[in-house]
A protein has these predicted regions:
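A short, Lys/Arg-rich alpha-helix, primarily the initiator
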Residues: 1-18
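Residue-level signal for the short linker/turn that defines the boundary of a DNA-recognition helix
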Residues: 10, 20-21, 47-50
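Short alpha-helical DNA-recognition segment
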Residues: 20-39, 54
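Recognition helix of helix-turn-helix/homeodomain-like DNA-binding domains
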Residues: 31-47, 68-71
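DNA major-groove recognition helix of helix-turn-helix/homeodomain DNA-binding modules
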Residues: 50-65
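Short, charged recognition helix plus adjacent turn
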Residues: 68-95
Length: 95
């Protein structure tokens, strides 16, 4: 396992969408610019550990999920299920 900024960005974008925020709204919640969030979501910029912590707390997921993609165990159960469904749907499209 290793840190992949593109995968981290995809997970952040998926969380943002599941929470019902657009990039402008979400960037305000986590105190960064919309353009910075956009760069993070496409993997052009790596989020700081402080930002990852803030996103994890806001989204109800673990840092393990954000960084490594491990399914959240201590976070919001409903959101965790939505993430699993979203992941499986994306995987199915690739088949």
């Amino acid at each position: 396992m290793y840190f992949d900024p593109k995968e981290v960005g995809k997970r952040i974008a998926r969380l943002r969408e599941l929470l019902g925020y657009n990039q402008e709204q979400y960037s305000q919640k986590i105190n960064i610019s919309r353009s910075a969030l956009s760069k993070i979501e496409i993997g052009d910029r790596s989020p700081s550990i402080d930002l990852l912590i803030e996103i994890a707390e806001l989204s109800g997921v673990t840092l393990d999920y954000l960084i490594l993609g491990r399914t959240p165990q201590d976070g919001n159960k409903k959101l965790g299920m939505q993430l699993v469904i979203s992941f499986l749907t994306e995987l199915e499209k690739e088949l």
